[in-house]
Amino acid sequence: MRKDIHPEYVECEVTCACGNHFVVMSNKPQLKIDICNKCHPFFTGSEKIVDTTGRVDKFKKKYNLK
C-alpha cells in the first residue's frame, strides 16, 4: 500500500435520535443517525402487522365488486 493516500481510520461515536451511543471504526469521528437497533420496531418487538384484507373488502364493497 502506498503511504499518505488512505483516509485516517478512527473510532467513531455513533449517536441515535433515541439517545443510544456506540462506537465503531470509520473515517469520521462522529455520526448522528435517526434509528438504531434499540429503537427500530423490528428489533424492539413492537412491529405492527397491517391487515390489508379489511382494506380490500372495503374497496370491493365501495365499488360493488365480487
UniProtKB/Swiss-Prot annotation:
Tell whether Cell membrane is among the UniProt keywords: no
Record note on cofactor: Binds 1 zinc ion per subunit.
- Please name the PROSITE patterns in this protein's record: RIBOSOMAL_L31
* Keyword Cell inner membrane listed: no
Keywords in alphabetical order: Metal-binding, Ribonucleoprotein, Ribosomal protein, RNA-binding, rRNA-binding, Zinc
Picking any one GO molecular function of the record gives: structural constituent of ribosome
Cofactor(s) for this UniProt protein: Zn(2+)
Kindly list the GO CC terms recorded for this protein: ribonucleoprotein complex; ribosome
Binding-site residues for Zn(2+), renumbered to this chain: 16, 18, 36, 39
Q: Name one GO biological process term.
A: translation
Oligomer status and interactors = Part of the 50S ribosomal subunit.
HAMAP family, per the entry: Ribosomal_bL31_1
Q: Which PANTHER family does this UniProt record tie to the protein? A: 50S RIBOSOMAL PROTEIN L31, CHLOROPLASTIC, LARGE RIBOSOMAL SUBUNIT PROTEIN BL31C
Family of this protein: Belongs to the bacterial ribosomal protein bL31 family. Type A subfamily.
Protein function: Binds the 23S rRNA.
Which protein are we looking at?
Large ribosomal subunit protein bL31
* Organism in which the protein naturally occurs: Nitratiruptor sp. (strain SB155-2)
